[in-house]
């Protein structure tokens, strides 16, 4: 970038920043970089196609007008994806761009009557730590929050326990209310939705129930996978979804798996869940875990050495809740023993947690329990003589994993599955092994279940 273009861009950023929220600026503009200027146009590098799409639709005129304000000339702005510039595969943004925002920069949350009272004030975009594992889900959530029902509807966020799905959902609700205090925002878990429906049916208050969930601008439902298999709940939510979507109201859903992987979910709901955008959150990498710990220490005003946080990030890998919990445990242990926080002290404080994780042995009953829960079955179903596909296939997956993850003999595995012959176990193992070579859905299912087994 030449010096003149550099100066022009710096002055432009000052204007753009004053016209946007801090979160929006950091997400969409900060990573951009001007690469060339001609008599009529300016080319600006952006990290990926998703960012380019947002910039073209929402911020192109703002950037152009800001440049005009600086140099008194209106240029045609062209956003170019980095990969197109370098003729390489799309470049992944480095975690060096993780933003530990100043906690004092968060706007005051405006509570809009009882509808927003279920939103956790701690779960905002400013308090969310961005890393490679969640960058796309964060950007998608912010895009929806900035333009409800105009960007992606529905937005479907999925990922494992404790990875930040609920945080993002609350952040969307807060952001919308900050910018529109009259918006009707409702956040609810699928369990609460189901329980309220049951009570409404029992008390003959169906219309009140429908009015509550259909007369809103934004509906956020957490853990939507739990409505699978519940016929009346799915029926009610199907009509609620249709009415809201037809009325151009925003719907945000979260789950522990993508729609296509939710067993016993009605096809008509599955297809609707896939209408908008599906974004996943992965287990955080080491750099993101470190950033999360530093953010937590900053929020709690704790002084913790980098080597101690590095030790925690190395030992606790599964999810954010455990990571933050480990930090608090170490601080509490330090206070109770009146000792300085060191790596040795951290090792003492976490020895029970770490030993459990390192000494954990996978068992066939644990595999059966997780597979049964995953497919909404009972363990007895896996041990039964039923041969219908909805039972037989999960049983074969459980046998495959039992062979793969334990040291049990084939006869012993067969015995654990209702006294089946070892040849049945061999058949199941070979069938799943063969299907894994070409079936992407099965690959995802087995990978997901394996993670759950290792974290159990």
Swiss-Prot record:
One of its GO terms (molecular function) is lipid binding. ATP binds at residues 162, 164-166. Residues 118-334 are annotated as: Domain III, AAA+ region. One of its GO terms (cellular component) is cytoplasm. GO terms for biological process: DNA replication initiation; regulation of DNA replication. PROSITE patterns: DNAA. InterPro entries: AAA+_ATPase, Chromosome_initiator_DnaA, Chromosome_initiator_DnaA-like, Chromosome_initiator_DnaA_CS, DnaA_C, DnaA_dom, DnaA_N_dom, DnaA_N_sf. Residues 73-117 are annotated as: Domain II. Transmembrane segments: none annotated. Its main location: cytoplasm. The keyword Nucleus does not apply. Residues 335-456 are annotated as: Domain IV, binds dsDNA. It is found in: Cytoplasm. Keywords: ATP-binding, Cytoplasm, DNA replication, DNA-binding, Lipid-binding, Nucleotide-binding. Plays an essential role in the initiation and regulation of chromosomal replication. ATP-DnaA binds to the origin of replication (oriC) to initiate formation of the DNA replication initiation complex once per cell cycle. Binds the DnaA box (a 9 base pair repeat at the origin) and separates the double-stranded (ds)DNA. Forms a right-handed helical filament on oriC DNA; dsDNA binds to the exterior of the filament while single-stranded (ss)DNA is stabiized in the filament's interior. NCBIfam families: DnaA, PRK14086.1. Oligomerizes as a right-handed, spiral filament on DNA at oriC. Domain I is involved in oligomerization and binding regulators, domain II is flexibile and of varying length in different bacteria, domain III forms the AAA+ region, while domain IV binds dsDNA. This is Chromosomal replication initiator protein DnaA.
């Amino acid at each position: 970038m030449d010096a003149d273009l550099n100066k022009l861009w710096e002055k432009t950023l000052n204007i753009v920043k004053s016209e946007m929220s801090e979160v929006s600026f950091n997400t969409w503009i900060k990573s951009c970089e001007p690469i060339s200027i001609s008599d009529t146009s300016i080319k600006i590098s952006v990290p990926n196609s998703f960012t380019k799409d947002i910039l073209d639709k929402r911020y192109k005129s703002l950037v152009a007008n800001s440049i005009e304000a600086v140099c008194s000339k209106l240029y045609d702005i062209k956003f170019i994806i980095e990969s197109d510039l370098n003729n390489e595969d799309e470049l992944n943004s480095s975690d060096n761009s993780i933003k530990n925002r100043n906690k004092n920069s968060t706007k005051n949350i405006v509570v809009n009557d009882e509808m927003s009272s279920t939103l956790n004030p701690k779960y905002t975009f400013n308090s969310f730590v961005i890393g490679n594992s969640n960058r796309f889900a964060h950007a998608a959530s912010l895009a929806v929050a900035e333009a409800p029902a105009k960007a992606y509807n529905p937005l479907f966020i999925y990922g494992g326990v404790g990875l930040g799905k609920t945080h993002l959902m609350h952040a969307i609700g807060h952001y919308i209310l900050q910018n529109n205090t009259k918006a009707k925002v409702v956040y609810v878990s699928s369990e609460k939705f189901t329980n309220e429906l049951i009570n409404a049916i029992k008390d003959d208050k169906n219309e009140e129930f429908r009015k509550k969930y259909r007369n809103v601008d934004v509906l956020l439902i957490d853990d939507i996978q739990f409505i699978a298999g519940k016929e009346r709940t799915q029926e009610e939510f199907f009509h609620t979804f249709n009415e809201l979507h037809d009325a151009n109201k925003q719907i945000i859903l979260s789950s522990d798996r993508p729609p296509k992987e939710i067993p016993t979910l009605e096809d008509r709901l599955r297809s609707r869940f896939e209408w908008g955008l599906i974004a996943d959150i992965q287990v955080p990498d080491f750099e993101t875990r470190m950033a999360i710990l530093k953010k937590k220490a900053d929020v709690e005003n704790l002084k913790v050495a980098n080597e101690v946080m590095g030790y925690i990030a190395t030992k606790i890998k599964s999810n954010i809740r455990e990571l933050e919990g480990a930090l608090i445990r170490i601080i509490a242990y330090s206070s109770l023993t009146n000792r300085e926080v060191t790596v040795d002290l951290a090792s003492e404080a976490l020895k029970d947690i770490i030993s459990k994780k390192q000494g954990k042995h996978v068992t066939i009953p644990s595999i059966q329990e997780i597979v049964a829960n995953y497919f909404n079955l009972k363990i007895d179903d896996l041990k039964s003589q039923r041969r219908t596909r909805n039972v037989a296939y999960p049983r074969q997956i459980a046998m495959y994993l039992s062979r793969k993850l334990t040291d049990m003999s084939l006869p012993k595995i067969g015995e654990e599955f209702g006294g089946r012959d070892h040849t049945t176990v061999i058949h199941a193992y070979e069938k799943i092994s063969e299907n894994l070579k070409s079936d992407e859905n099965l690959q995802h299912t087995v990978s997901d279940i394996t993670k759950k087994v290792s974290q159990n």
